[in-house]
Amino acid sequence: MAEAAMAKSIEIPDCCYPKEPVLVRPSSSKPRHTLYLSNLDDQKFLRFSIKYLYVYKRSVGVEALTTSLSKVLVEYHPLAGRLRPVGEDGEKCQVDCNGEGALLAEAYVDLTAEEFLQGCGRPNRSWRKLLYRVEAQSFLDVPPLVVQQVTHLSCGGMILCTAINHCLSDAIGTAQFLHAWALLAAKPDANLPVNAFHDRCILKPRVPPEIAFSHPEFSSPPAQDSHSGDLFQFLLSQPLVPVSLTFTPSQILHLKKQSVPSIKCTSFEVLASHVWRAWIKSLDPPASLRIKLLFSMNVRGRLKPELPGGYYGNGFVLACAETSVEELVTSNAHHGIKLVQEAKKRVTGEYVRSMIDLLEERRVKPDLSSSLVISSWTKLGLEELDFGGGRPLHMGPLASEIYCVFLPVTGDLHAFTMIMSVPHEIADRFQQYCRRGLDDDDDDDDDTEKGGSG
């Protein structure tokens, strides 16, 4: 397992902006209208931007990027609009498709691609210099497509940072948009392979609502004793450090073999279970504490009828696996994998409809008190984004957060990179638990281990 958790992180010098950022408008206008956001789009915990960072060996001219962005915004016109509150309480949002444009900044920095790559496994706060800061009084003041910043490097390469509002799309949607933009930058006369479908009315709640399931991803567990605390609040109170680990195909296969009895499972299922278990063991909460794993699931094909091809809204929900600390850490890999599989199986079309109806109440939010959240950016082709100067040398998030992201590995379709931030005091321990069971010399020995401090 390659690791970059404690590698030296690169400090980004200040960027030089030769001119003011520009608002790039769609190259042809559409009639102004408002776009309904579904309850899956308009959850308060999604009111942030998905931020990607790309490093390229060769720069692409900013004129080509601007022209292609203007073209692609015709197909993805809501991204050139603005969020607006709806109703007297302003709790719900919609998109004012007014064509005001997406922000594009150009910058220069005294840094080479090689220098950046030496420390790219450990994001830090200085990386935020690579994304132009939009001053705003509130979330609603920020454009749905907040900013694209092209930063030219001293070696002739470039770093491209993008920030796309999560209320407009999920990871699948952002990848769809970025691939379309890259295609038009590299081949201006190309036809887009996928047409964006923006209408969210197919996901409107039922009248009256039919909440037919308990939805543990939103409900909090029964009150715990004061000793147990709140894992989420504990994490927020701690100095955090990013941990980045890459799992090779052979290591993932070896993890699958740790399940007794054996179980047919995907790479995501075994890695999600493995990382969850390592995270809990390193935090060492009370053995009786009820814990959850929340992970994003694409439901485009699970609804009846299915969402149309090219659907450009949030088409995911959080699936929920739940157990106790003691059950998770004293069982072998089979237990955690089975929990993940059962959580996936519960997410049927009716389950999603029930969740949409539940969200109409506007009072529920994901239960993060004792949960690890995992989002997978693999299998989206994000590592293949070519704007005309070649594929990226590096692709990843702009920042590391307390939730976990699975990333693709350039050149190896079957490997995964995991990145997340953990308290500094447990970072080494977390890595040690992640390494267990990856090869014959370091098989997991959890049958003799009694995790949990309570």
Language model: regions and residue ranges:
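Non-catalytic N-terminal regions of enzymes
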Residues: 1-224, 232-296, 300-311, 315-316, ...
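Catalytic core of tubulin tyrosine ligase-like
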Residues: 336, 355
